[in-house]
């Protein structure tokens, strides 16, 4: 389905605006969003200090209250800290942890296997791998994804590399052991045609029903209609990345009347 990579709204003081956050989540759920991904890239996790990060995860899990699944951003380039956040998210009742590849350190493929194995071993929380080499400088190989998919707690991938040859090879190797979600709103339909499970979506912040409908049409095997709908919103999707995410999407939400802060 369509999981929203939800923004984090802030007050003018720089604190998280939980009152507005709640309204945004209610709107998302009412308009078809299938899951909430909190403290991801779009949620500015890398700009939150530890206390803010943990508070946002805990609050979101409590507020959503099982209406839809909650996926908590728990990744870090520090393996020990990623383990801490993953355990914390599990204690809060998150349904999965989204764990980005270790950035800046630029580890090897063997290092990626060691990093994610340690995280997946720390508790029973399902782990969704997050491949976004344009931000991290690190990219999984298909062989690495295959090795990681053997772990019972690693069962998902947010694919934001844009490399369909890599994805096709990985999906062929991993089969049902790895569920793949697009990390790019302009690639939902082609990825789902290969067997992908949907999208972790920036678009959903401003058009949740549209993102949901695109994925549902794919599930219903109505790919021409899904492609037509995706292309209908291509210019909007493109505009959401005219500057570094989440600047454009927060501006778009502001224009729609949401109080999102800086």
Residue ranges of each PLM-predicted region?
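GST superfamily/GST-like fold recognition
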Residues: 253-255
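Active-site beta->alpha loop and helix N-cap motifs at the rims of alpha/beta catalytic domains
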Residues: 1-4, 8-137
């Amino acid at each position: 389905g369509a999981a929203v990579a939800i923004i984090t709204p802030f007050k003018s003081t720089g604190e998280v605006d939980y009152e507005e956050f709640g309204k945004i989540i209610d709107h998302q759920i009412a308009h078809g969003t299938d899951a909430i991904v909190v403290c991801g890239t779009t949620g500015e996790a890398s700009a939150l200090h530890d206390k803010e990060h943990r508070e946002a995860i805990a609050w979101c899990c409590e507020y959503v209250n099982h209406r839809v699944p909650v996926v908590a951003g728990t990744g870090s380039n520090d393996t020990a800290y990623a383990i801490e956040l993953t355990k914390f998210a599990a204690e809060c009742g998150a349904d999965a942890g989204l764990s980005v590849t270790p950035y800046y350190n630029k580890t090897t493929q063997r290092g990626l296997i060691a990093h994610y194995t340690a995280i997946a071993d720390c508790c029973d929380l399902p782990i969704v791998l997050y491949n976004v080499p344009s931000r991290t400088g690190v990219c999984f190989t298909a062989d690495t994804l295959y090795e990681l998919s053997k772990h019972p707690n690693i069962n998902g991938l947010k694919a934001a590399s844009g490399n369909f040859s890599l994805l096709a090879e990985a999906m062929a190797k991993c089969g049902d052991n790895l569920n793949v979600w697009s990390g790019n709103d302009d690639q939902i339909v082609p990825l789902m045609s290969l067997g992908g499970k949907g999208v972790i979506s920036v678009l959903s912040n401003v058009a949740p029903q549209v993102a949901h409908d695109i994925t549902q049409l794919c599930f219903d095997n109505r790919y021409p209609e899904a492609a037509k709908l995706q292309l209908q919103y291509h210019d909007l999707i493109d505009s959401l990345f005219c500057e570094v995410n989440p600047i454009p999407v927060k501006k778009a939400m502001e224009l729609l009347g949401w109080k999102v802060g800086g």
